Structures are given as C-alpha cells and as structure tokens.
From Swiss-Prot:
Intracellular or extracellular location(s): Cell inner membrane
Keyword Cell inner membrane among record annotations: yes
HAMAP family per record: MurG (MF_00033)
Species this protein is from: Chlamydia abortus (strain DSM 27085 / S26/3)
GO terms of molecular function: UDP-N-acetyl-D-glucosamine:N-acetylmuramoyl-L-alanyl-D-glutamyl-meso-2,6-diaminopimelyl-D-alanyl-D-alanine-diphosphoundecaprenol 4-beta-N-acetylglucosaminlytransferase activity; undecaprenyldiphospho-muramoylpentapeptide beta-N-acetylglucosaminyltransferase activity
Record's function text: Cell wall formation. Catalyzes the transfer of a GlcNAc subunit on undecaprenyl-pyrophosphoryl-MurNAc-pentapeptide (lipid intermediate I) to form undecaprenyl-pyrophosphoryl-MurNAc-(pentapeptide)GlcNAc (lipid intermediate II).
Protein name: UDP-N-acetylglucosamine--N-acetylmuramyl-(pentapeptide) pyrophosphoryl-undecaprenol N-acetylglucosamine transferase
Principal EC category: transferase
Gene for this chain: murG
Family: Belongs to the glycosyltransferase 28 family. MurG subfamily.
GO cellular component: plasma membrane
Length: 358
C-alpha cells in the first residue's frame, strides 16, 4: 500500500530548465491534494509563473567555487544564511518530503532537509547528472529521471518518470496562424542561452525563405532578447513571423511546428519528445556540456533531428541544415522516430514513484 503524502517542499532555482519542471510538478502534486511549498531563489519574477498563485519562500544561496577569496567568503555566508532560513521554513511547513530539482540554488534547502532528517528525493532532467544531484543522491530515497542513460549515475534508486507538462491551450489563435502557413518553424533559445540563436538563426531563415516563400517563423527570443532587432531582420527579408520574449503556451506552438531550432535544455527536450517535433539542436556549451549530451541522445539514440555545435555555427551551415530538415521525407522519418520512442517512455508519475519509495 502506498504511503499518503500531505505536504511536499520543492527546492528550486536557476534557469528555466530547473524551474519549469518544478512548477509543472507542483501542479501535478496539487491535483493529488498535496500542499506544496517552493523554496529557492529567483522565482518571483520568472515568466513561467504566469498568473499562478504559489506558496513560495525566497532562500539565499551561493556556490562555493574557486574564486577570489572575498567572493568565496560572501558566497559561503550566503549559503549559510540560506541554510538557516531553509531550516526555519521547513520547521514551520513540516513537509513529508523535500524534492531537489538541481542547481546550486537547491543546495541550502537540501542541506537543511538532511539536518532535519526529512526524506529527500531528487529530479534529474538531463542525460548527465548535475553536481548537486549527484552529491545528494547518496542521501536521497530516490531520483526521478527524464532520460534512462542517467539512471546508473546515482548512488540511490533511480527510475524514469513522466515529467509533468506545462499547461497548454486547446484553442490558441497563435496555432491557428501557424497552421495556415507551410512550413512553420519555431526558434527557442531558452531563458539563458538565447543570444547566440537570436544572432545566427534569423539571417539563415531569411535565406531559407527564398525556397519557402510561405514559411512562418515563431521566434521566442528569451527575456534579454532584442525583439525589435530580430523583427527587423525577418521583416527586411520578407519572412512572416512572430517574435516575443516568452511563450506562455509553448506546447501548442511545438505541436504546430514542422521544425524546431532550439538549445538542448532538459525542459525543451522533454517537450520536443512529447510534441514529436523534429528539431535542430544547438547545445549551450557551458555547464559541464550537459546540453551536448542531451542533444546526442535526441539525435543519435532517438533519431529526432540533427545537432550543430555552437563553434560550428555559421549562416551557411545553418541554412544547409534547415533545408535538409525541411525535406518532407526527413520530417516524416524524424517524427516517426520520436513517436516510437515516446510510446515506450515510462508513464509513472513522480508522485507514484515517491509513494512507492517511502
């Protein structure tokens, strides 16, 4: 018999690749009647929140890496302050379980949970484990993963789970516009890695439009993207487009796209699989190159698209890859490969996995 869970605290912060899965998990747990508290840093203004009303407490954090001594001292002090505040919030909320979603922002909360002997679970979104998740797996009850290759990298039981998806609209005027064009291309660079795609992709798509004059581009430029400049490139090239900083209804856009040009962060990877969207992946080169490993899995194991390393990016390389990706037979084969993989993915929820492990 599975144990009933009444309260869960989620330790989260950092990029959208950590925050979006945590918010989707929160929604899934709330549907199970669980009270959920988010503990972390930088969530209050994150665009993924939309109009959601969440129970959230800001927790200071710091990454004690090899930097200048004064910076290291400040970070350690911030980490300790976060640890103390996390202990206080956990004492007040009294959760049955704490779940860490990776990034150093989860560190003080996981430390506090360990000190208070609250069961810890982790969620790993990538093909390669993050440092905090790998460290705390030796203390955790279990790890829910998005991709099977990472299971063997942890010191506790790990299992593939079905990552909850962002809510999406069954009717969206954006989708109506997308489906009236052919082909439709979505460009999305993520919350932190969009600049390179914003600089390189629009000129290549202007070139591609010479072969596809009815092409439509939906470009998500990210919170720091220069929307006006990108619009100018498409407009000057005669390309039909929509450019925006953030797309609240990303799944609807992916479902309606013939090709997605994207980074290879964990959240977009999982959503590309769900939407069965053939893709060109341009992995962000930082953060121990985990996006490159994500992209390799998507391209070589699943067969869902192609990969271009950032150091290989040029207008000519992008144009060639986009034209190849828009070939109808290529789209058909890649979509079938994605469908075959997704049909065999685990359907077990994180909630079920946690209840079974307790």
């Amino acid at each position: 018999m599975m144990k009933k869970i009444n309260k869960i605290a989620l330790a989260v912060g950092g990029s959208g690749g950590h925050i979006v899965p945590a918010l989707a998990t929160r929604e899934a747990f709330c549907r199970e009647g669980v009270d959920v508290l988010l503990l972390g840093k930088g969530l209050e203004n994150h665009p993924s929140l939309g109009e959601q009303q969440i129970l959230y407490k800001e927790i200071p954090s710091g990454l004690p890496t090899f930097v200048r001594p004064i910076t290291a001292v400040r970070r350690v002090c911030s980490l300790y302050a976060g640890y103390k505040k996390a202990k206080k919030e956990l004492l007040i909320f009294d959760p049955d379980v704490v779940i860490g979603f990776g990034s150093y922002h989860s560190l003080p909360v996981l430390m506090a949970a360990l000190k208070k002997k609250i069961p810890i679970f982790l969620h790993e979104q990538n093909v390669v484990p993050g440092k905090v998740n790998k460290l705390f797996s030796r203390f955790a009850k279990g790890v829910g993963v998005s991709f099977p290759p990472v299971i063997k990298r942890f010191a506790c039981p790990a299992q593939e789970i079905a990552l909850p998806k962002r809510a999406f609209s069954s009717f969206n005027p954006i989708v109506e516009r997308l489906t009236s064009h052919s082909p439709t291309i979505c460009v999305v660079g993520g919350s932190l890695g969009a600049k390179t795609l914003n600089d390189h992709v629009p000129p290549a798509l202007v070139e591609v439009a010479k072969d596809y004059p009815h092409m439509y581009v939906h470009h998500v430029a990210g919170p720091k993207g220069d929307v006006v400049s990108i619009q100018h490139v498409y407009s000057r090239g005669g390309v039909s487009f929509c450019v925006k900083s953030f797309e609240q209804d990303m799944l609807s856009v992916l479902l309606s796209s013939d090709l997605v040009i994207s980074r290879a962060g964990a959240t977009i990877m999982d959503e590309l699989l769900w939407a069965q969207s053939p893709s060109i992946l341009i992995p962000y080169p930082g953060a121990y190159r985990h996006q490159e490993e994500n992209a390799k899995f998507f391209v070589y194991t699943i067969g869902g698209g192609s990969m271009i390393l950032e150091k290989q990016l040029s207008k000519a390389v992008l144009t060639k890859n986009i034209l190849l990706a828009l070939d109808p037979e290529t789209i058909k084969n890649r979509r079938e490969a994605l469908r075959a993989y997704y049909q065999n993915k685990s359907s077990k929820s994180f909630y079920q996995f946690i209840c079974e492990c307790l």
